[in-house]
């Protein structure tokens, strides 16, 4: 059900396209869909040519010399190369026999990626050297390109060397999160466990924002060291930090726990995966099969049924762009004449490019789409919806595909559509889908309801968010206290984004009355918002509520308060918070300290400014910065608390160092 492919070989379409070329002197394609399909045919011809033992170099040269060949076709043909020699064949043929073709950034990057994938470091370095010598005009490899290429190629020395150059270049202040992730993974692969931990520590110290992939690497590292329980604890902490749990997280853990025959944990992960609205990746197929063989048929039946290949999908076999067959029957006849070992492939398909070709939804484009005979699976439709830019086009496609033979929308496709509509403020259409879901008895994942509420904050639709929270959250079934707290937090954040301060405070009161306590991040977000609005009494009331419900003010909360008070020109209040931090043996980071000092000077509080400077100097003189708040974490007002990140870091460090010693 979830395979991506054409229902019929695309051979008949070739003759249609070639026929069309005669009538269109400027643009041989009446619409972008037919252009996409022609490109797909050409890519498939090249793919088959590279894999067939009977195909001559002349055939490949003929395909690569086609007058409609472009960088898009070359890029994807290179990416589909089955070997380095195949990629070199494309590269050399284009260089020597196709003078009209000019290598661009995307084609050279694709070629470099193939060399890296097959770990041909010397050839990769040669290509990088040629590119850096400006032999290909304006083509350039950035530091991030190089880090990714070297890491893929397994050239870890070059990764670390490039990382040092990157940090010294000034291209980024300290380096983006993904650069830290690459280095962290390299150290993990090399078995340099303490260096991997130090790299994670660097992300925090240098103001980076750990993302989902950061925690993927951490979980993989712990699994590699045999610390499955610690890996599971990290995974369970992610929702607290509002970090999205990805399919990669689930795949790594499911595989590890199946290997350890700890099937209770696997059942928990499967249930969580459904709640998060995730569908298993291919990597999970074998572990789930093994789990079924161990007697857990009921738990795995749904996923395995949908992961099996779709019988409607047919392979493509050898055909030529220059001599296409006119029918399926002729194609079958051709198959009988070739060797039994003939190459067969699933047709090439790029959901992003196909969605882009439908940018202008028209009757001609729809006709071309129908004639292509795609098998519309739920996974393909999800990928298409993700890549539409305009909600109107996405909605037209969503409605059109609903009436295609053999296709039925499910919770996954509905979530994709709802997310786009909510982000763009299309409240009526979201309500229409919700009504349909309710009538048909479809159960939505909890993550869908929460996502809609979050996205209504972006589109500034607070009433719609309140309506979803109050009336539609039952569509995901029973909600745990923890998930209800997350849902309340999302609603509060949306209301503050929309400047609906009164409703936010009413919602907070309702939350407390129902016995659901906000976490420290929610309080931090509210206090920061009201401090920026200049509502100091509300901030103080919220601060007292933190202690009333038994929470300890988070160091990051105190830091946020200092920043907020400074920005609304209440530096005296910021100084009081600074004193509270000092009394608790904490100091803000340098950036926050400098903001406080500037604010105090601006408001002519010179004595207080000098006291802050003196306190900071004393701390440095003690040569013990362990009590200096290290968390910059810009942009994480509502998400990561210093307590959570410290707990994760300590767990990771202790497990890794204990195992290493």
Swiss-Prot record:
Signal peptide: none annotated. The keyword Acyltransferase does not apply. This is Pentatricopeptide repeat-containing protein At5g66631. Belongs to the PPR family. P subfamily. Keywords: Repeat. InterPro entries: At5g66631-like, Pentatricopeptide_rpt, TPR-like_helical_dom_sf. Transmembrane segments: none annotated. PPR repeats lie at residues 139-173, 176-210, 211-245, 246-280, 410-444, 445-475, 484-518, 519-553, 554-588.
């Amino acid at each position: 059900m979830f395979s991506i492919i054409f229902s019929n070989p695309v051979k008949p379409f070739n003759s249609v396209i070639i026929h069309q070329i005669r009538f269109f002197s400027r643009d041989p394609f009446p619409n972008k869909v037919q252009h996409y399909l022609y490109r797909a045919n050409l890519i498939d011809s090249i793919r088959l040519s590279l894999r067939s033992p009977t195909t001559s170099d002349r055939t490949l040269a003929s395909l690569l010399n086609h007058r409609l060949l472009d960088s898009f076709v070359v890029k994807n043909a290179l990416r589909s190369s089955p070997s380095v020699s195949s990629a070199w064949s494309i590269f050399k043929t284009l260089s020597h026999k196709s003078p009209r073709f000019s290598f661009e950034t995307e084609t050279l990057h694709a070629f470099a990626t193939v060399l890296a994938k097959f770990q041909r470091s010397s050839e990769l370095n040669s290509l990088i050297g040629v590119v850096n010598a400006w032999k290909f005009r304006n083509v350039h490899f950035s530091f991030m390109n190089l880090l990714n290429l070297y890491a893929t190629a397994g050239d870890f020395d070059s990764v670390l060397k490039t990382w040092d150059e990157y940090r010294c270049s000034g291209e980024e202040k300290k380096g983006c999160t993904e650069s830290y992730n690459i280095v962290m993974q390299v150290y993990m692969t090399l078995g340099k466990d303490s260096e991997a931990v130090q790299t994670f520590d660097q992300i925090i110290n240098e103001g980076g924002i750990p993302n989902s992939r950061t925690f993927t690497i951490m979980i993989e590292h712990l699994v590699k060291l045999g610390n499955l329980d610690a890996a599971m604890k990290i995974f369970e902490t992610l929702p607290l930090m509002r970090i999205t749990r990805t399919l990669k997280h689930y795949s790594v853990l499911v595989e590890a726990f199946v290997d350890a025959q700890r099937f209770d944990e696997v059942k928990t992960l499967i249930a969580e995966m459904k709640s998060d609205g995730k569908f298993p990746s291919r990597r999970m197929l074998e572990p789930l099969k093994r789990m079924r063989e161990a007697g857990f048929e009921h738990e795995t039946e749904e996923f395995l049924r949908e992961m099996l290949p779709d019988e409607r999908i047919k392979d493509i076999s050898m055909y030529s762009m220059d001599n296409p067959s006119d029918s399926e029957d002729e194609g079958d006849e051709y198959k009988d004449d070739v060797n039994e070992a003939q190459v067969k492939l699933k047709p090439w398909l790029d959901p992003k490019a196909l969605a882009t070709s439908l940018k202008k939804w028209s009757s001609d484009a729809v006709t071309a789409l129908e004639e292509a005979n795609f098998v519309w699976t739920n996974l393909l439709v999800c990928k298409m919806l993700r890549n539409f830019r305009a909600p109107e086009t996405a909605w037209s496609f969503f409605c059109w595909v609903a009436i295609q033979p053999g296709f039925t929308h499910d919770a996954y496709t509905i979530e994709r559509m709802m997310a786009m509509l909510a982000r763009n403020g299309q409240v009526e259409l979201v309500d229409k889908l919700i009504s349909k879901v309710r009538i048909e008895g479809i159960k939505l994942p909890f993550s869908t309801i929460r996502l809609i509420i979050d996205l209504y904050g972006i589109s500034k639709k607070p009433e719609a968010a309140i309506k979803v929270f109050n009336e539609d959250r039952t569509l995901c079934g029973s909600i745990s206290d923890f998930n209800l707290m997350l849902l309340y937090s999302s609603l509060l954040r949306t209301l503050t984004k929309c400047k609906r301060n009164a409703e936010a405070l009413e919602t907070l009161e309702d939350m407390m009355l129902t016995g659901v306590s906000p976490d420290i991040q929610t309080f931090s977000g509210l206090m920061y918002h009201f401090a920026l609005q200049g509502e100091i009494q509300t901030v103080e009331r919220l601060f007292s509520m933190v202690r009333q419900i038994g929470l300890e003010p988070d160091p990051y909360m105190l830091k946020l308060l200092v920043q907020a008070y400074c920005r609304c020109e209440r530096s005296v209040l910021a100084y009081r918070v600074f004193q509270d931090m000092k009394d608790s043996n904490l100091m803000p980071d340098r950036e926050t300290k400098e903001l406080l000092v500037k604010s105090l000077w601006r408001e002519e509080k010179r004595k207080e400014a000098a006291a802050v400077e003196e306190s900071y100097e004393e701390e440095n003189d003690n040569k013990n910065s362990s009590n200096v708040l290290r968390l910059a974490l810009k942009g994480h007002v509502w998400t990561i608390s210093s307590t959570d990140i410290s707990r994760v870091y300590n767990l990771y460090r202790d497990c890794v160092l204990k195992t290493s010693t």
